């Protein structure tokens, strides 16, 4: 198969020869390894490779795009250029039209590096640890299930301006679920890395299943809740995915809208000094430091491909600081351009309530949640969301977990939760249960919410 760099060069040259006013070619070489397990035994494992090619052709101020996944060679990219250019010539002027990004130097983003790959051996340590875990689960009369996966994506970007960029992005995760023999009790832990301490994860499963020995029934109502980093990460992900659109706010469609097409940027949304930010060079969760997209939306533009990304504070010290805009949208609105960044961090100044266990020890009566699931937005104007607890709701009394409780549906807004939080734990590397698949790189604290709205009892188990 033709090397990715040669495919990029061929696409750019083909577009120039076809009379395109500009061109962007992106090639992503993917490599994936995984293992799945259930009923205390491994069930499947595999390794696969992938290639995704995207072409953007510019005609005047219009753009056309084409994307293919699979074995794409020179003939394939020629077909893609022709299709993208035909679409561009037939399209009206693009709302996100802007000059393509000019050449800028960054030796760290080498276009010449060979694609990196993963293979089955990266899972050897996990598989070795699982063998002992399965034995201990059988001895306890418990059942373990879950999966481990590792991806390496090598991205190549080239444009008709002469810009060339490359980036390697590894991503890993291990999810572990334990269930009691009767299936009535369950616990979940996960780590966003392929090399966790599986024994530590396993011990946490056993601790939580021990809590399941005594159960209580809870009714709907408002409860003091310790929301763990996983749940906080999922809610902050939904807030940034759905709520941080600058165009959406100006159109009156989000929680950060104001009358007359204005936005709430600059307004305080929390008395605590929360800072929610994204930064491609944040230690431990580094990510692609330039714009790379095969399609435009109201917030991201194909014209911005290759543009360097720096740190963006979405919320700074309790006030809304930025919304998401591409260059054209930012220019129209007279604000800073702020693209999507593939990581997310929540901190709260000097506030550090310690670990989840530390926060439990300071709780007179409340609930400890494991994670959130089936999170869906109900009202974009308030960022109201509904969802379910999953794999463990625990009753805390006098600083200790005393029983497990039933699952409960919640109705809450992430913005309101930040406003009502009374304690913030130590930010840690975390993995959201629902959105971790899409946003693996997060650092989140646990939050204490004094009046979390549990709207109805769930029969889920």
PLM region spans:
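Active-site bordering "gate/hinge" segments
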Residues: 1-291, 295-301, 316-317, 400, ...
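Dual-mode signal for accessory low-complexity, basic/Gly-rich regions
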Residues: 261-461
């Amino acid at each position: 198969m033709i090397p990715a760099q040669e495919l990029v060069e061929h696409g750019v040259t083909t577009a120039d020869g076809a009379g395109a006013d500009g061109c962007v070619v992106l090639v992503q070489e993917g490599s994936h390894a995984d293992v799945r397990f259930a009923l205390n035994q491994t069930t499947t494992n595999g390794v696969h490779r992938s290639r995704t090619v995207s072409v953007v052709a510019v005609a005047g101020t219009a753009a056309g795009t084409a994307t293919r996944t699979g074995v794409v060679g020179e003939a394939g990219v020629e077909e893609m250029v022709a299709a993208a250019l035909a679409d561009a010539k037939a399209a009206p002027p693009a709302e996100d039209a802007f000059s393509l990004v000019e050449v800028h130097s960054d030796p760290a983003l080498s276009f010449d590096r060979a694609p990196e790959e993963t293979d089955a051996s990266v899972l050897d340590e996990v598989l070795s640890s699982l063998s002992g875990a399965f034995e201990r689960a059988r001895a306890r009369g418990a059942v373990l299930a879950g999966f481990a996966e590792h991806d390496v994506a090598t991205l190549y970007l080239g444009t008709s301006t002469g810009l060339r960029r490359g980036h390697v992005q590894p991503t890993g995760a291990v999810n572990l679920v334990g269930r009691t023999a009767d299936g009535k009790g369950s616990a979940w832990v996960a780590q966003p890395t392929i090399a966790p301490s599986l024994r530590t994860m396993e011990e946490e499963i056993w601790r939580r299943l021990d809590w399941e020995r005594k159960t209580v029934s809870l009714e709907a109502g408002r409860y003091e809740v310790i929301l763990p980093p996983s749940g906080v990460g999922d809610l902050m992900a939904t807030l940034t995915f759905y709520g941080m659109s600058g165009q959406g706010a100006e159109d009156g469609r989000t929680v950060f809208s104001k009358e007359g097409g204005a936005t709430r940027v600059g307004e305080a949304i929390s008395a605590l000094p929360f800072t929610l930010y994204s930064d491609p060079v944040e230690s431990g969760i580094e990510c692609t430091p330039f714009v790379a997209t095969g399609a435009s939306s109201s917030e991201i533009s194909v014209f911005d491909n290759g543009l360097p990304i720096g740190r963006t504070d979405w919320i700074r010290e309790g006030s809304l600081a930025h919304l998401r805009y591409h260059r054209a949208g930012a220019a129209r609105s007279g604000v800073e351009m702020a693209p999507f960044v593939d990581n997310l961090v929540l901190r709260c100044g000097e506030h550090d309530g310690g670990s989840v266990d530390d926060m439990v020890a300071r709780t007179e009566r409340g609930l400890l949640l494991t994670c959130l699931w089936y999170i869906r937005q109900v009202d974009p104007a308030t960022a109201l969301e509904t969802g379910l607890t999953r794999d463990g709701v625990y009753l805390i009394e006098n600083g200790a977990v005393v029983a497990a409780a039933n699952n409960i549906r919640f109705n809450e807004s992430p913005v309101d939760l930040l406003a009502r939080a009374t304690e913030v734990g130590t930010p840690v590397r975390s993995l959201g249960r629902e959105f971790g698949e899409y946003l693996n790189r997060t650092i989140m604290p646990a939050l204490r919410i004094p009046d979390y709205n549990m709207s109805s009892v769930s029969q889920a188990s």
